[in-house]
């Protein structure tokens, strides 16, 4: 049986983890990106504003981590979005569809009681590396 290499991803181009975990882990050709918050990578503070601004920054952090893992938003197969208030669903979707604007990945969205650092939005994903072909089956 061959050994699968587990690569631990860390990039200075995204906010650092706020607890003991890696920004992402790559196993074989699959990238598991930890939850990204709307943190400024330099100050490690939540960006000013509300759910729209936090979602935008969280997605920028997610994109930076994906790039460090030799992947990208076009290779994301599953997103999970955590919201402090599900009433922010529409506002977050407006930001989300600017980043994921075609061939949408699978996605779940949950309202949660609390997020780290009192964030309003957290986004994690699973993506692929290497060459990826998309086919639509109906």
UniProtKB/Swiss-Prot annotation:
One of its GO terms (biological process) is mRNA catabolic process. PROSITE patterns: UPF0076. GO terms for cellular component: cytosol; mitochondrion. Pfam families: Ribonuc_L-PSP (PF01042). GO terms for molecular function: deaminase activity; protein folding chaperone. Coiled coil: none annotated. Keywords: Chaperone. Molecular chaperone. Seems to fulfill an ATP-independent, HSP70-like function in protein folding. May protect essential factors of cell proliferation during heat shock. No role in calpain activation. Belongs to the RutC family. This is RutC family protein UK114.
